[in-house]
């Protein structure tokens, strides 16, 4: 620019012929564009704007759908967690009930075995005492028969001794 100014060419000087031809050329270009391309350009711009608006609307609907899906997922997760807690609690209750039942059954079984053993011991004791009494009766009969030197009938003397032992048992009980 310094060179142009030095050579005497003035850039700031307005040339009226150049201004007119520039305006005429510009007007012709605008007219040609308006006549042949303006509608197509506007139509393309409108299509582009509607496409962008459609994409925005689609993105918004996808966002809403994603939020809805996320909420449903969180609800399902919450329900699944609650169900899992319920199942665990129920399993704990079942385990406690089963433990109580098994403990009670074992206790009852032990009690039954103990009662059975006590009955068997009592029966064995009764048989042993009965056998001892019978032996005592027999020995008493033998001793008494030798002492008296008289042979009594064994059954008579045995019944006599049994009656006497029964009297002694009654006295012991009182």
UniProtKB/Swiss-Prot annotation:
GO molecular function, one term: proton-transporting ATP synthase activity, rotational mechanism
Entries under CDD domains matching the protein: ATP-synt_Fo_b
The keyword Transmembrane is assigned to this record: yes
Signal sequence extent: none
Entry keywords, A to Z: ATP synthesis, Cell inner membrane, Cell membrane, CF(0), Hydrogen ion transport, Ion transport, Membrane, Transmembrane, Transmembrane helix, Transport
Transmembrane segments: 15-33
Record localization: Cell inner membrane
GO cellular component terms given for this protein: plasma membrane; proton-transporting ATP synthase complex
Superkingdom of the source species: Bacteria
Topology in the lipid bilayer: Single-pass membrane protein
Family to which the UniProt record says this protein belongs: Belongs to the ATPase B chain family.
The protein's assembly and partners: F-type ATPases have 2 components, F(1) - the catalytic core - and F(0) - the membrane proton channel. F(1) has five subunits: alpha(3), beta(3), gamma(1), delta(1), epsilon(1). F(0) has three main subunits: a(1), b(2) and c(10-14). The alpha and beta chains form an alternating ring which encloses part of the gamma chain. F(1) is attached to F(0) by a central stalk formed by the gamma and epsilon chains, while a peripheral stalk is formed by the delta and b chains.
Function: F(1)F(0) ATP synthase produces ATP from ADP in the presence of a proton or sodium gradient. F-type ATPases consist of two structural domains, F(1) containing the extramembraneous catalytic core and F(0) containing the membrane proton channel, linked together by a central stalk and a peripheral stalk. During catalysis, ATP synthesis in the catalytic domain of F(1) is coupled via a rotary mechanism of the central stalk subunits to proton translocation.
Protein name: ATP synthase subunit b
Organism: Leptospira biflexa serovar Patoc (strain Patoc 1 / ATCC 23582 / Paris)
Name of the encoding gene: atpF
């Amino acid at each position: 620019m310094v060179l142009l100014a030095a050579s005497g060419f003035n850039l700031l000087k307005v040339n009226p012929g150049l201004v007119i031809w520039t305006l005429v050329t510009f007007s012709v270009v605008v007219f040609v564009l308006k006549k042949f391309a303006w509608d197509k350009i506007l139509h393309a711009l409108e299509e582009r704007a509607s496409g962008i608006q459609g994409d925005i609307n689609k993105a918004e609907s996808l966002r809403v759908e994603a939020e809805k899906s996320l909420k449903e997922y969180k609800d399902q997760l919450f329900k699944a967690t609650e169900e899992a807690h319920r199942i665990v609690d129920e399993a704990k209750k079942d385990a406690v009930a089963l433990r109580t039942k098994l403990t009670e059954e074992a206790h009852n079984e032990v009690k039954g075995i103990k009662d059975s053993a006590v009955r068997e011991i009592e029966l064995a004791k009764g048989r042993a005492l009965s056998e001892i009494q019978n032996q005592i009766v027999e020995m008493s009969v033998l001793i008494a028969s030798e002492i008296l030197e008289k042979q009594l009938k064994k059954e008579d003397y045995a019944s006599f001794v049994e009656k006497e032992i029964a009297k002694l048992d009654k006295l012991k009980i009182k």
